[in-house]
Amino acid sequence: SAARKKVKDKNADPYSKLTFLGLIALLDPARIEVKPAIETCIKAGIEVIMITGDQAATARYIGIELGLISKEDSQVKEGKEIKPYEELKGQDLEDIKKTKIFARVEPAQKLNLIDIYQKDGSVVAMTGDGVNDAPALRKANIGVAMGQRGTQVAQESADMILEDDNFETIPIAVKEGRIITDNIKKFVIYLLSCNVSEILLVFLASILYMPLPILPLQILFLNVVTDIFPAFALTAGEGSDDMMDKPPRDPDKPLITKNHWFITAVYGLVLTLTVLGTFAIALNILEIEVARAVTISFLTLAFVQLWHVLNMRNFNTKIFANEVFRNKYIWGAIGLSIFLVLLATYMPGLSLVLKTVNPGMEGWLLILGMSIIPLIIGQIWKTFGKEISLFS
């Protein structure tokens, strides 16, 4: 509060007969971008807990403003209300886990809270900027220090530094991490399914006593020159629109699960049967000579693998509006690979090395018609089906 008083003597009592002027309140609100950032975290399955040195009433007001708690929720715990760590059992421990806001918390209590959540199976990220935050930043699975106002001790103890001191950056970083993880999965599944198809193609042709449908140098050409470009283009994807609407990945599970290996094998088998069917049609129905049939088989495998990259989109996304279709690098890679495949077919020196010949009009019609079969199957599955979970 503010008040005034006129005195004739400087030694007069300063606290009597004052004229009240008014109350002065200091407001230090959270940044406007924090609330939507917290909402994004919650949608992404990330639980946000506020630990502050402010008084409980102040912490509760900020928590309501940020949407962490409702006005009816009075669940704010002060440090003095928390029992010693070794005494926390049963209902007391459950109350701690349900609490969204902690006020007047001591540094040692921060360590205890982190330990409680970690033992509950949570991956804990901790933000901080002061020297007192350093032990908690070090103990957390991910310590996040402030880059502008953070102390050197806090920054050295952290795993990550927010250069802009902005909470909004955290969900952005989480999204980038999820996109990278998703792109790695796509890269591995695509490249391995293409390689599996090449292995199965030679294996099945051998046990069926068919002529070799693809030559060793042609396989090497596909691996080194063509399918590698779409694979790398997948790593530049921007992720699906619902990337932050999914729960976090279980850190105890491998990046490529048994289900992914199964899907890879299924894709490889579909690609193999398509190429083998094309080769059989060329030899037995169209009665094309072996040299030209091998070229048709080689080109079918090349185009099958190129169209197959479009099957790497996520489930239940739209055919023409998904993270793969709008990836401009995918289309550049497909265009470049088609150009290289045409060079391998028609460029005199290269075609001689790879033993390719002009497939002719009927050959091209067969190639283009058969090569889209795996794409059609994949698109139907991704649109109307769901991810296989055989080994969960």
What are these regions (language model features)?
Residues 42, 52-53, 187-195, 362-366, ...:
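Hydrophobic alpha-helical segments characteristic of transmembrane helices
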Residues 70-125, 140, 145-316:
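Membrane-embedded transport module
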